[in-house]
Regions:
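The catalytic "switch" region of P-loop NTPases
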Residues: 1-22, 275, 281-384
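Walker A/P-loop-proximal flanking segment of P-loop NTPase domains
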Residues: 1-78, 85, 89-91, 148, ...
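Long, low-complexity, polar/charged, intrinsically disordered or flexibly structured peripheral segments
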Residues: 195-246
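Conserved Walker B catalytic segment
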Residues: 240-294
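Extended, well-ordered alpha-helical scaffold/bundle regions in very large, multi-domain proteins
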Residues: 171-174, 294-315, 484, 500-533
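C-terminal helical "lid" subdomain and adjoining coupling/linker elements of P-loop NTPases
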Residues: 278, 358-359, 369-484, 495-506, ...
């Protein structure tokens, strides 16, 4: 039996390791819902969320007007984006199809959650009419918007969802005014007659069709063409962009449609950074949406930092009062590293019934050897432990429990030290995919094999700054270093800035072990020789 044969699901399947907020096609949605692992930690977060949100679906929602914010935090790769994306499917009760079968999002959770009362709360929430708008704020913002960026993105995604012009808010405002007067359909009909094209198709090029717009407005409203032309010419100047107006427009839409609305904003913490004015805008938008919309409009954001850490530096530096935003985002969900390891085990590393006794036999024969082989030296600051039981060995093999902690630190350090390109810096690479890539590399090998740490380098290589990856590639190909030397160089690069693990000789030996029965004395000699080159 080789490593490829021990897993319940194929190692080479598409697991959507890269979660993109706006990739919501049926095929992706089905896989994400079907394979989503509700760990103990995630079930706790879901309970906390629905305890907060369910009252907003009933007559007591007005009492929620000051508590309509949810702040989801966690380190890079912890699953924040995946969590709110799954929430978006669930709260909109998204219908997905796969091979002729149709299911609603809620049905996937009936198999994942055993608590009937908790399921009843979820069921109540998902069957309340709700409009969910999920977006990555950085991908939707214009670089020139600066302090108004957050408000403009909120307005942009709202206009887009309700059918108005997304890219030009003053055009959307014209559409909204015509709709209020009951003249929007007449305007679109007149425009189509005049131009032989639809308004929705042409409105982003309104600069080139101002005469046609004026004529269509005249026919729809009954005013003169000259008055209509003046209206068109003044649209941009007269557009009232402020937070209060935005919230009023949301309220009017909610009143008309009898729904709740959720703005789910991915990576808001990274987008705001240390910009005090942006944080104040987010605070005001959340506060006004809560009050004006009476608990029917919610804001759910993700951030690598928890809310106290995100605003702490700003308050001390600029003397601003962010106490309101702390109150508005009263529901705070922090994803941890334990959640990541459990997700990887359940999505990637579940073993077949035939593999479990085979691995149990390996542990019974080699357990003591594994404990000694995979221990780090006393300089190690974190509790980076090897396997402690047969069950843990079976659950994690061919990986070691400390792989999760160290790889998390590697991802964080590469980002913060500037070695990563834009995609990795924006959270476009997950630990799940890194573990899948490493497992695939050793899949033909037997059950005496382990994953040496350098195997994780392949998962991030293409996302490094070209100068960094080129240096490592050239060093490996210069004729002086052999394959073992090159692999050790990759290990040294990966742990260079990892503070919980020093690159001592003994630690490098432990990280380089690729067989259970590796001769550690001989491996130490090879590592030492390689370091001296």
């Amino acid at each position: 039996m080789n490593i490829e044969q021990i897993f319940e699901k194929r190692l080479d399947r598409n697991i959507n390791g890269v979660v993109k907020a706006e990739q919501t096609d049926d095929a992706s949605a089905w896989i994400e819902l079907d394979e989503y692992v509700i760990t103990r930690e995630l079930e706790g977060h879901l309970r906390h969320f629905f305890e907060s949100y369910v009252p907003a679906t009933g007559p007591d929602r007005i009492r929620m007007e000051n508590k309509i914010g949810v702040w989801v935090s966690g380190f890079f790769g912890s699953g924040k984006s995946h969590f709110i994306k799954i929430l978006s499917y669930l709260l909109s009760n998204r219908k997905v199809s796969h091979n002729g079968t149709e299911r609603h999002a809620y049905s996937f959770f009936e198999d994942k959650i055993k608590d009937a009362l908790f399921l009843a709360d979820i069921n109540k929430a998902v069957h309340h009419p709700t409009e969910v708008i999920l977006f990555n704020i950085d991908s939707r913002a214009n670089v020139d918007d600066k302090e108004d960026a957050i408000l403009k993105v909120f307005l942009k995604v709202f206009n887009e969802r309700v059918g108005y012009c997304a890219d030009f808010p003053h055009i959307a405002h014209l559409e909204r005014e015509l709709a209020k007067r009951g003249q929007y359909d007449a305007f679109k009909t007149a425009f189509a007659t005049i131009t032989d094209s639809s308004w929705e198709k042409e409105r982003d090029s309104y600069y080139f069709i101002s005469d046609e717009m004026a004529e269509a407005l005249s026919q729809a409203t009954g005013q003169s063409v000259d008055a209509s032309r003046q209206w068109v010419e003044q649209l941009d100047k007269n557009f009232p962009l402020d937070i209060n107006n935005f919230c009023q427009w949301v309220k009017e839409w909610l009143d008309e449609n009898g729904k709740n609305i959720l703005f789910m904003v991915d990576e808001v913490g990274q987008f705001i950074g240390k910009n005090t004015q942006m944080m104040l805008k987010l605070q005001t938008i959340t506060e006004n949406l809560g009050v004006i919309c009476g608990g029917r409009a919610w804001v759910i954001v993700t951030s690598q930092a928890d809310i106290n850490a995100a605003i702490g530096g700003m308050s001390s530096r600029d003397g601003q009062d962010f106490s309101k935003i702390q109150g508005r985002f009263s529901t705070r969900l922090q994803l941890s590293s334990s959640n990541t390891s459990e997700v990887i085990q359940k999505r990637l590393l579940v073993k077949t019934d035939a593999a479990k006794p085979a691995l149990a036999k390996v542990w019974q024969e080699k357990g003591d050897i594994l404990r000694n082989q995979l221990a780090f030296d006393p300089t190690t600051t974190a509790s980076l432990r090897p396997y402690t039981s047969e069950e843990e060995f079976i659950d994690n093999y061919p990986f070691v429990p400390w792989h999760y902690q160290i790889l998390q630190k590697v991802f964080e350090s590469i980002r913060t030290k500037g070695a990563a390109g834009k995609q990795l810096a924006m959270g476009e690479r997950s630990q799940l995919e890194a573990f899948q890539t490493a497992a695939q590399q050793i899949s033909p090998q037997g059950l005496d094999s382990l994953v040496p740490f350098w195997r994780f380098y392949a998962a991030i290589e293409s996302f490094l700054e070209p100068a960094v990856s080129r240096t490592i590639t050239q060093a490996c190909q210069n004729g002086i270093l052999d394959e073992f030397d090159g692999n050790l160089l990759k290990t040294l690069f990966l742990i260079r800035y990892v503070d919980v693990l020093k690159s001592t000789l003994d630690n490098l030996v432990t990280l380089s072990i690729d067989k259970i029965d590796t001769d550690k004395v001989e491996l130490r000699r090879r590592v030492e020789k390689s370091l001296n080159k």
